[in-house]
């Protein structure tokens, strides 16, 4: 019932409400077969087409608890991450899905530092420069989102999902402007890459030198065609519609 109604995507691009599961290893009475039973349960959930927002696997240790069979525990954890978590992540955050209201937290690492409050990290001047920006949507157990260029911290924006990690996803912002987008921003768009991005930036610079004070191109599509680069409708997901 929760999946029936909770799997509907809301305004921010996420399913509205999904359950999570916690597996605790080391409880009294547990045996090695317990891990296989837990894995069988997860596979049954997936065969039924049900979604889970998260799966936590924890170890309980200390006086009064039994020893954990490490080999069985590690195999269970690896199986869950490889056969359950990966496919779930791709289904929850499919390629091309737009996620809105992402809050940008850190540059070039997942740990929030005092330095990240400096103007060098929060001002608009850092946008599009080389590096990685990490952010999340507000909520319980928000997915970590990485973007392969700098975005001013303490800001929010929308992204298109472009890839999946083990426990995170990558994305590229929407609303990129052909007049301002940097080479690093272009490189982050699937299907473009470093060489094509350099050609586009060079063509824009030439056009601006030829027509100073004017916009180089009326649209991203015109820009690509003027650079002899095939335009894909997929690119329109990322660019501002002028």
For each of these PLM feature ranges, what is it?
Residues 50, 56-67, 72-93, 97:
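Catalytic cores of secreted or luminal carbohydrate-active enzymes
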Residues 1-66:
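Conserved C-terminal portion of the radical SAM core fold
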Residues 77-179:
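Terminal RNA-binding accessory module
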